[in-house]
A protein has these predicted regions:
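Terminal-appendage/accessory-domain detector
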Residues: 7-24, 31-197
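Conserved catalytic cysteine-centered active-site region
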Residues: 1-5
Length: 197
């Protein structure tokens, strides 16, 4: 139940906005606390806290997990974050890299003057988390931007379609980095016209 906005057949705006909304609530909570607003006491050891429901403790004096509070320093969680390579779920990066490497190594054979008839199927071998998150059959026909950027089928086929459409500008001497930049999926690649192309 905790993944409801991040999983399912079609993802919505809630998925795309979840980080922003939680940040907004956190900032609002800090402002209220600075103005003297007091929240419930001891939410981690409270027997009614959601944390206690999921991870029961032996008695009421223990928290189900350790929490370390700091007031200064540079060991913040944000420093452990990484950025996605583009507008797609990061589990697709290895498949995208494989496709781009294949286009780089076999430019003429794959792009064949923009003719897709030489491509009869695409087989992607991936690891379980990638399949479970973006490869399952529920993600085959996305109808929203949020579902499309979580669909391995959509991401790979869109990059390949983009390469075929722009075949005249793709040269064998392009570097892998050039191809990544050139074939990067943009917001327009997730618009209604692209979704139903």
């Amino acid at each position: 139940p905790w993944r409801a906005i991040r999983a399912g057949k079609q993802l919505s705006d809630s998925k795309g906005a979840s980080a922003a909304l939680s940040t907004e609530v956190a900032i609002m909570a800090v402002h209220r606390a600075m103005a003297g607003f007091i929240g419930p006491k001891d939410i981690f050891r409270n027997p009614e806290a959601i944390f206690r429901q999921l991870e029961p403790t032996k008695d009421h004096s223990h928290s189900p997990f350790d929490i370390v509070l700091s007031k200064s320093g540079d060991d913040f969680a944000v420093m452990q974050m990484h950025f996605k390579l583009g507008l797609y779920e990061h589990q697709s990066a290895s498949a995208i890299d494989g496709l781009i490497n294949m286009i780089s190594e076999h430019t003429d054979a794959i792009l064949d003057g923009g003719n897709a008839d030489n491509i009869s199927k695409i087989k992607i071998t991936s690891y379980e988390p990638a399949y479970g998150i973006i490869g399952d059959p529920a993600k085959r026909n996305p109808t929203t931007r949020q579902s499309a950027d979580h669909s391995m089928v959509y991401i790979i086929s869109s990059i390949l379609r983009k390469a075929l459409e722009k075949h005249e500008n793709i040269k064998a001497e392009h570097t892998i980095e050039d191809l990544w930049k050139y074939l990067m999926l943009l917001p327009v690649d997730y618009g209604k016209n692209a979704l139903f192309n």
